A protein has these predicted regions:
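Conserved MFS/SLC helix-loop-helix module at the cytosolic interface between two early adjacent transmembrane helices
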Residues: 73-106
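Hydrophobic core of transmembrane alpha-helices in multi-pass small-molecule transporters
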Residues: 25, 112-126, 232
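Glycine-rich segments within core transmembrane alpha-helices of 12-TM secondary carriers
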Residues: 144-166
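Cytoplasmic helix-loop-helix junction between adjacent transmembrane helices
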Residues: 117-152
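Cytoplasmic membrane-interface "Motif A"-like loop-to-helix N-cap segments
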Residues: 84-95, 283-296
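Short amphipathic helix-loop junctions that connect adjacent transmembrane helices
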Residues: 36-58, 243-259
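Central cavity-lining transmembrane alpha-helices of secondary-active solute carriers
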Residues: 62-80, 264-276
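Juxtamembrane intracellular "pre-TM" segments in multi-pass secondary transporters
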Residues: 2-13, 200-229
Length: 300
């Protein structure tokens, strides 16, 4: 009887992880589009209509886009809704919010409207409800490993973008819209999978109370200091890699084969890093195991 319950629990955990991987793949694909095909929509939305160079168009759109990034600040509101609506409902709302953003980016011929659509995509990306599922259902001894697997799935999805770009982009005006159409199809598929297979939340009868907040002065929470070091170290490296983005690669090499190859290789490196860091994180004993759950997804 005990072995049957154990096998049932393992099967349920495997199904949950598989669903989370599917969610992460769709999430990563949609979030990577802006960075991976930037030179393509810049050409059709800004360079050709305004007779600008790629350098000037990149500076312009990054400057104009700054106010639109503020919409990502709403993401804590979405996470807070989990306590009232439940994880599955918020996750479905989050997924469905992708579709109008992708649709705007696919159909518009105005870069301002394009940025509005991209801001909706950025908002959906920043919520990351799947990590709440890890904290709620995955054993604490395996959380970092699962988190590493999801990060690797995200990197693999990011690596698929230049592959799809090579097939879908033909050089015609606005053909980047196909990439967003694929994003709509992927998001709809993920939403159906979540709706059918992910269990609905049970009502919580006894609210949990926070008895003590982690501080650096508390020796039992000394992992928080380690967390700060890791965030700053990885943040510096991530910023450097993000700075070397698709428009800069395009300006440097100007060859589709080399551009797609670089965009493909970068995420593959993060797959190794994320899986290794997750496995090593679970080998630590004590409270250092929780550090991995505090880390935001890398190389989004």
């Amino acid at each position: 009887m005990r072995s049957e319950k154990k096998n049932t629990g393992l099967a349920a955990g495997a199904v949950l992880i598989a669903i989370l991987i599917i969610i992460q793949i769709g999430d990563s694909y949609c979030s990577e589009l802006y960075d991976k095909i930037q030179s393509l929509f810049l050409m059709d939305l800004i360079m050709n209509p305004l007779n600008m160079s790629l350098e000037d168009a990149t500076v312009m759109i990054n400057s104009v886009a700054i106010p639109f990034y503020a919409i990502s600040l709403i993401s804590p509101v979405f996470r807070g809704m989990v306590d009232y609506l439940g994880k599955k409902k918020v996750l479905l709302i989050n997924l469905l919010l992708y579709i109008p953003g992708l649709l705007l980016c696919m159909t518009t011929r105005k870069y301002i409207v394009f940025l509005i659509g991209n801001s909706l995509i950025s908002l959906s990306t920043s919520v990351d409800i799947q990590y709440i599922y890890i904290a709620s259902f995955i054993d604490e001894k395996k959380r970092a490993t699962v988190r590493g697997i999801l990060a690797a799935a995200a990197a693999l999805s990011a690596a698929s973008v230049p592959v799809i770009r090579k097939v879908a982009i033909t050089g015609r005006p606005y053909d980047y819209a196909r990439m967003y159409g694929i994003g709509i199809a992927i998001t709809a598929f993920v939403a159906v999978i979540v709706f059918i297979f992910l269990p609905w939340d049970k009502k919580q009868t006894t609210p949990e109370k926070i008895t003590q907040l982690p501080t650096c002065g508390n020796k039992r929470n000394s992992a928080l200091i380690y967390l700060y070091i890791v965030i700053f170290a990885w943040g510096a490296g991530t910023s450097g890699i993000k700075f070397y983005n698709e428009p800069m690669i395009t300006m440097r090499f100007k060859t589709d084969y080399i551009i797609n190859r670089i965009l493909f290789i970068q995420p593959l490196i993060t797959i190794i890093i994320n899986i290794a860091s997750g496995i090593m994180g679970d080998r630590y004993q004590g409270e250092k195991q929780s550090v991995q759950m505090w880390l935001p997804p890398l190389f989004r």
